[in-house]
Amino acid sequence: MEKKRIGIIFGGRSGEHDVSLLSAASVIRAIDKEKFDLFYIGITRQGKWLAVPQVFGRDIDGDHDITADIIENGSWEKVGEDFNPGDLKKYVDFALPVMHGPYCEDGRIQGLFEMLDIPYGGCGVLASAVAMDKAVSKELFESAGLPICAYELITADEAKHDNDKAVERVEENIGYPCFVKPANMGSSVGISKASDREQLKAAIELALKYDKR
C-alpha cells in the first residue's frame, strides 16, 4: 500500500515560533515513518515558507535521520528552499500544522488548507478563531450561562489614550493580585502577574507587544 504523505508545518510569525520548533521535533520523532512519508515545511519569523529536506548525520553506527534535530535547534533555515504554499497539495495528502499562536491556532492557516482542499489536523476555521480570541470566547461562554472568572478587556487604543482609566477599572472590578495576558496568544507568552498598579501597567504594556488587546 502506498504510504500517505504528511506535511509537517512548523515555525511561523508568532511569538511562539521557538515553541513550535520543539513541538514539531517531538511529532517528527513520534510518527511511524514506516507508515507515512513526511514532507517538512518551515515558516520563518518573517513569514517565508521553506521546504526542508530530510537530513542525515553519520556517526559510528552509520547514517541517522537528524531532521528533527535541525528543526529543534533552528538550523533548518540554512538548508530550506523557497516554497510556494499554493503548491502544497502537489506534495501532501494531509497537513499537520504544528504551530502555536497567531497565524496558526487562530484559523488563518486552517483557511488556507480549506482553500487548497487539503485535509488537516486540528480544529476548523471558526472553532480555531473563536477559541484563540480569549475575549470572544469568554463572551460566548457567558452567553451560554457558563461560569467564568472575572475579566476586563483592554484594547491597545484604550491603553494608549486612557490607560489610567483602564487600570482603575481593573482595580475596581478585579483587584490585586491579577493576571494579564494577550487575548490572542498561547502557552505563557506575554503573561504577567500584577500585585500593584505599577506592575499592572508594565503587564499591560508587555501583553500589548503580542496582541492589539
Which residue stretches match the model-derived regions?
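Active-site nucleotide/adenylate-binding loops and adjacent lid/helix of ATP-dependent enzymes
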Residues: 2, 6-10, 14-15, 22, ...
